[in-house]
C-alpha cells in the first residue's frame, strides 16, 4: 500500500493554479469490489484540485458502484448499457460529461484510470506538473508499482511486427528474451521522457488531443487499446510522457483474471488486430500469418497447461 502523507498540507507557494471547474476522472467499473473504496479513499491525497469521478459502469452486479455514490461526494454512476469494453466505456463517459455544451468539468485535461488503482500522494498534481513541462504531451502517465512494490514497465516502445509479435509469443516462456527487453525498455531506469505508449491503467489525457484522434479505437474490446491510443497520438504530433515523480499502485487483473483462458484469447485478438492494422502491406502477409499462427499455438499451450493444473489441484 502506498503511504499517505501525515504531515501538514503543502503551502500556497507549493501549489499549482487550480481551475474553477472540477477535473473529470473516468474509471471503468465491472464489479470492482473493495478495490473501488481504496481507489476513492486514496484519491483524496492525489491532488488539491476539485474532482468529479465518473464510474463508467459496464454492468457491475456487486453493488460497489452504487455504494460509492452513497458514500462519497462528487462521485457519479454512468451506466454504459452493457459490457462495452474499456475504451468504448471511456469514450461514452467523455462524450457525456466533457463533450457537451453544458459540461461543468475542466475542458483541458481529464484522467482515465482503473478502479483497482491506489493513488500516491500528490500523484495527479505531479502529472499536471509534467504536462506543463511538456506542452506537446497528449497523454501523461505515472510510475506504476505492482502489489509487491516492484516497478511495472508501463512506459514502452511501440511494438513493431517482429518485436511486438515475438514479445507476445515467447515472452511468457522466455522472460529474458531480447525482444521483450527492448519493447518494455527494461534496461532503462525510471526517468521523465517521451515514450511510445503508456499503460492505460492511469493516464492524464489532453482533451484536445483525445478529440483530434477520435478517442479510443472501439475495435479493441479489451487489451491494446492503450497501445493504439499512444501510437495514434504520436502519429498526430503529440507526445506520450512518462512522469515517474507521480506514483500509483495497481492491483492488476481484479476483473480480467476471472477467466484466464478467455482473457488470453482476447489479448491475442487485440495483439493481432494492432499488428495487422499497422502492417497491412501485401509483402508483410507472411509475417502476419506467422504471428497469427504463433499466437494460436501459444494460446493452446497456455490454456492446456492451465487446465492440467486445475485437474491436478482437484
Question: Where does each model-flagged region fall?
Answer:
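Conserved donor NDP-sugar-binding/catalytic core segment of glycosyltransferases
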Residues: 118-153
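Short aromatic/hydrophobic "clamp" motif used to bind/position activated sugar donors
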Residues: 110
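Short, flexible, basic/aromatic active-site loop/helix in glycosyltransferases
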Residues: 159-195
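Active-site-adjacent helix/loop segment of glycosyltransferases
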Residues: 228-310
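A short, conserved alpha-helix in the catalytic core of glycosyltransferases
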Residues: 187-247
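Short, acidic, metal-binding catalytic loop of nucleotide-sugar glycosyltransferases
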Residues: 41-50
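Glycine-rich, basic loop-to-helix element that forms the pyrophosphate-binding segment
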Residues: 80-105
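A conserved acidic beta->alpha catalytic loop
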Residues: 49, 57-65, 82
Amino acid at each position: 500500500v502506498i503511504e499517505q502523507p501525515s504531515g501538514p498540507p503543502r503551502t500556497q507557494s507549493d501549489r499549482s493554479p487550480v481551475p474553477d471547474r472540477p477535473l473529470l476522472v473516468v474509471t471503468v467499473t465491472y464489479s470492482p469490489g473493495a478495490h473501488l473504496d481504496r481507489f476513492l479513499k486514496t484519491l483524496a491525497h492525489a491532488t488539491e484540485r476539485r474532482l468529479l469521478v465518473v464510474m463508467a459502469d459496464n454492468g457491475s452486479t456487486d453493488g460497489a458502484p452504487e455504494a460509492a455514490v452513497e458514500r462519497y461526494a462528487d462521485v457519479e454512476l454512468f451506466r454504459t448499457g452493457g459490457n462495452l469494453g474499456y475504451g468504448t466505456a471511456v469514450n461514452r463517459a467523455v462524450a457525456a460529461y466533457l463533450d457537451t455544451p453544458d459540461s461543468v468539468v475542466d475542458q483541458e485535461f481529464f484522467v482515465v484510470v482503473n478502479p483497482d488503482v491506489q493513488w500516491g500522494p500528490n500523484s495527479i498534481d505531479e502529472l499536471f506538473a509534467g504536462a506543463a513541462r511538456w506542452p506537446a504531451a497528449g497523454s501523461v502517465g505515472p510510475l506504476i508499482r505492482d502489489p509487491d512494490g516492484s516497478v511495472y514497465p508501463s512506459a514502452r516502445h511501440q511494438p513493431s511486427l517482429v518485436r511486438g509479435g515475438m514479445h507476445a509469443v515467447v515472452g511468457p516462456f522466455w522472460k529474458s528474451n531480447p525482444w521483450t527487453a527492448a519493447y518494455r525498455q527494461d534496461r532503462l531506469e525510471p526517468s521523465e521522457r517521451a515514450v511510445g505508449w503508456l499503460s492505460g491503467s492511469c493516464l492524464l489525457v489532453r482533451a484536445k488531443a483525445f478529440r483530434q484522434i477520435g478517442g479510443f479505437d472501439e475495435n479493441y474490446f479489451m487489451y491494446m487499446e492503450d497501445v493504439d491510443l499512444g501510437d495514434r497520438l504520436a502519429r498526430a504530433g503529440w507526445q506520450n510522457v512518462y512522469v515517474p515523480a507521480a506514483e500509483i499502485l495497481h492491483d492488476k487483473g481484479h476483473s480480467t483474471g476471472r477467466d484466464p483462458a478467455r482473457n488470453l484469447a482476447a489479448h491475442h485478438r487485440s495483439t493481432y488486430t494492432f499488428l495487422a492494422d499497422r502492417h497491412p502491406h501485401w509483402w508483410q502477409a507472411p509475417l502476419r500469418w506467422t504471428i497469427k499462427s504463433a499466437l494460436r499455438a501459444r494460446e493452446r499451450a497456455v490454456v492446456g497447461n492451465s487446465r492440467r493444473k486445475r485437474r491436478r489441484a482437484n
